Amino acid sequence: MTKVTAQLSVSVDGFYAGPLFEGDGNWMDSAESAGFFRVTRWATEVSAWRERQGFAGGEQDTNSEVIAETFEAAGAYVMGRRMADGGEVPWGDEPPFRAPVFVVTHRPRETLLRQGGTSFTYVTDGVASAVEQARAVAGGKNVAVAGGGSLVRQVLKAGLLDELELHVVPVVLGTGLRVFDADLDLADKEAIELTPTRVLHTPQVTHIRYAVNGRAPLVLDDRGSGGGPTATR
């Protein structure tokens, strides 16, 4: 059964990139200074990621197994235009996806065909259309929302996301771009409810997978000590 999934590497305080990540320019050029590299470094050091990028070596450990599992489960991808444009040159003629990629954008462009099974189709009629087109060609495998963070929030807000995995890196950035920002636009006393389904801990990163249950009202639950608002369905 096809699931729509998303994964993001984040700091303990919830940032997936630092403040310099905003603004114009190629995000790949500014990634290291923006703190992006600090929360994704764990992935670049493992063999599964390096093999997809055409590099040798790398650690063969739990983190590598998580990366390999993610690639193998994906039958199609959805990503934002900024990520696609920023990756076009460094990914080269054989990008790591090896599957159709649907790029959410306001600017039309012809489909790009690359070696290894990767194609980039530019979708101008919204995130729901991109997800539906990806689902249609995923062959029963997952539709992976590759990012960036703004696109993940759009998919979550639209109720299209089935599974979210956060890779929590033991670092505090203090400022930058948050995974869950105000543009989720939740109503007053409303929450998006998640159920943890897997936790894998390593010294470099903790992988927490959630099933996305959808929106639910926040009500006052005074059972037990302390009470406080909780999400109920």
Q: Where do the protein language model's features map onto the residues?
A:
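Enzymes that bind and transform nitrogen-containing heteroaromatic metabolites
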Residues: 1-233
